[in-house]
Regions:
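N-terminal periplasmic accessory domains that precede
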Residues: 82-85, 104-110, 119-122, 137-143, ...
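N-terminal periplasmic "start-of-domain" segments of outer-membrane beta-barrel proteins
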Residues: 39-77, 102-105
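Outer-membrane beta-barrel pore domains and translocons
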Residues: 50, 155, 173, 186-190, ...
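Short acidic/polar hinge/loop motifs at secondary-structure boundaries
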Residues: 126-154, 240
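Acidic/polar loop-and-plug regions of large Gram-negative outer-membrane beta-barrel proteins
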Residues: 243, 252-305, 328-381
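Extracytoplasmic beta-strand/coil segments of soluble accessory domains associated
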Residues: 58, 83-130
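Flexible, solvent-exposed coil segments and beta strand-coil junctions
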Residues: 88, 174-182, 214-224, 277-287, ...
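Transmembrane beta-barrel wall of Gram-negative outer-membrane proteins
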Residues: 182, 189-219, 226-270, 294-310
Length: 381
């Protein structure tokens, strides 16, 4: 079994303070003219822990290259796949892996796309990966079907959010607590038994706000896997938020928000590919030897965010969070014919040279049974 527990210390985000320099009388010049220091008023810039941009206006006026996918855009297309959402963003390259966006491979500005390991992936400003330099898509990737907005920063402009100054950062903003009572249900059904349902309930009273969300995303899969054709998946997401806040017109405004999240996934996904000949004739086929491959994950998150708004243009956002992740990917790793060490072949060796390893390929595809054969699975943590 594989466990990842991550406790990260408190992060602080400070807005710039409006500075007004008092004009001071300078010495007079030879013409008797009085010179004064120029006075410049700076616009306030507020950076919250849960958002990098917050609007398309901020994205356009942000130093560096930034893009903001608004709630209106996400609602218009209704995508459940992050790969489709990010296709509208310039400088983003993506290649598919499972066809559903469960483990996306995202590249910003030509960085390595595999497992999105060269960019910072965040939800509400908190890293989704177990560590800054880990491959987040290989472990946990937030379910974008419940997201409110998507923010993208490319290049060194995202340095305050992570170490990948060449690539950038992608921040997924979760649904905020509504100002008035809201309840909704959204359901869709498509080919291959693909089903997606999202329900939410929330409100904000005088000093207390809350939100509860549930998302179920599943599919039977589009690949053919004889004899049982188990190539699908299901995912569950439950999120709860509770916020305590002062009056909007208070001299010093404050808010404290608690976020609790739980998600799990069960995927009949496999590392086993196809030989070149089989891929050309039936690209969506899966060998019988891979029918036991299975991925299981669990993820929990606790985040506490405090906001204090002082007079004079200073705002401080403090976030303390804890992430826990567990996964195990049971996958076919080798095919064995006999008891000797030399009678074992890896999947890579078999598919790279199927003619030389024809006996092993027959066992992998289920074409023949041999005495002493074994399909050897590995718990890939």
């Amino acid at each position: 079994m594989y466990y990842i527990a991550r406790r990260l210390a408190i992060t602080l985000s400070l807005s710039s303070v409006i500075l007004g320099a008092k004009a001071q009388v300078a010495p007079t010049d030879s013409l008797g003219e009085t010179r004064r220091d120029s006075v410049r008023r700076l616009d306030e810039v507020v950076v919250y822990a849960r958002q990098m941009l917050g609007s398309k206006f901020e994205a356009r006026n942000r130093t560096g290259s930034a893009y903001y996918l608004s709630p209106k855009e996400l609602k218009k297309f209704g995508y459940t796949d992050i790969s489709r959402m990010l296709r509208a963003v310039p400088g983003v390259n993506i290649y598919e892996e499972d066809g559903y966006g469960l483990r996306p491979n995202i590249s910003l500005r030509g960085t390595k796309a595999e497992r999105s390991e060269r960019i910072s992936l965040m939800e509400d400003g908190i890293l989704a990966a177990p560590a800054p330099y880990a491959a987040p898509a290989a472990y946990y990737f937030p379910n974008v079907a419940r997201m409110y907005a998507i923010e993208v920063l490319k290049g060194s402009s995202q340095v305050q959010y992570g170490p990948f100054t060449t690539g950038g950062a992608v921040n997924m903003v979760s649904t905020p607590i509504p100002k008035n009572f809201q309840a909704g249900l959204r359901t869709s059904y498509g080919s291959f038994g693909t089903f997606n349902t999202y329900a939410h309930l929330g409100s904000d009273h005088k000093h207390v706000g809350y939100l509860v969300e549930y998302l179920r995303y599943q599919s039977k899969g589009f690949k053919k896997d004889e004899p049982n054709e188990r190539t699908g998946f299901y995912r569950n997401d439950v999120v709860g938020k509770l916020r305590l806040h002062s009056d909007e017109d208070a001299e010093i405004r404050q808010a404290l928000e608690l976020k609790l999240g739980f998600s799990n996934e069960h995927s009949d996904e496999s590392y086993v590919g196809l030989s070149e000949q089989d891929f050309a004739s039936r690209p969506y086929y899966r060998y019988r030897g891979a029918q036991m491959d299975q991925l299981q994950t669990r993820h929990t998150q606790t985040a506490l965010t405090h906001l204090i708004d002082f007079t004079g243009g200073l705002k401080v956002t403090t976030s303390a969070y804890y992430n826990y992740f567990w996964r195990n990917w049971y996958k076919l790793n080798d095919v064995r014919i006999g008891d000797q060490k030399g009678e074992k072949r890896s999947i890579e060796e078999i598919l790279a040279d199927p003619e030389t390893n024809a006996r092993y390929l027959d066992i992998l595809t289920g074409a023949t049974d041999r005495l002493g054969e074994a399909l050897m699975l590995r718990a890939n943590q």
